[in-house]
Amino acid sequence: MSEREGHGIDAPDPAYRRLPTEGPHSPALGGALITWVEPMPEHVVGYNRWYEDDHMITGAMSMPWMFSCRRFVAPRWLQHLRAPADSRVAVPLEAGKYIGLYWVNEGRIDDHLQWSLGANYRLHEDGRGSYRGRGFDPTEERRHVFTAFHDYRGAFYRDAEVPRDIHTLAQPYEGLVVELVDADPAPGREALHDWLESEHLPRMVGGRVAVSLRFDPRPLPPDKLGHVREPEAVDRRITLLHFLECDPRSVWAERF
């Protein structure tokens, strides 16, 4: 039992009643955390058990305004599909076998980000930033290939029967294809969004490719945890997530 000054034993913090009454409270998708990680070979089992049994919950899903999540894995028999060979993100090209996707409510990404920073600093101080416990360096276990919070820009659906964007991570999609596209400085990212929506995605989405979602990555906050790599070119980059109803290999030549 504990006592909080002025509230008696185990009194709830009044902020928990006040904060939900303020600001947006929309069911819409407003942003995402996309985190693409490569564990070191000798730490694969320990890292994944820690991530799914602890960090995926306490470092993400139990926080306010985050409402859906899913992980995908790129096994060896899919990694040969990756391109370009001189990728500036996946170095080497097979790096980043695990990707976590997390949806954040519209209008709440800034609020969620502040909670996330506080919670993750606490977890590291509590010795839960590593599956090995306090005092161990996370960079010995894993490295972040591409991790960023994103602003949502829209969806391109195959047809009206495809579940809406907010439900995407709850659907039993068999595959995910991720594209990171950098815009030329001129005409810039908005022109690239227009081209993607009017020309690129209509050719790509269809058949067993059910939906594609577009996101703009944000710079990581200056007080981020030190082991998380700062993504490059976030002011020019667009992240595309293509959700498939099949093994990616079966539609790769046709769609990608």
What spans do the regions from the language model cover?
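Macromolecular interaction modules
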Residues: S2-F256
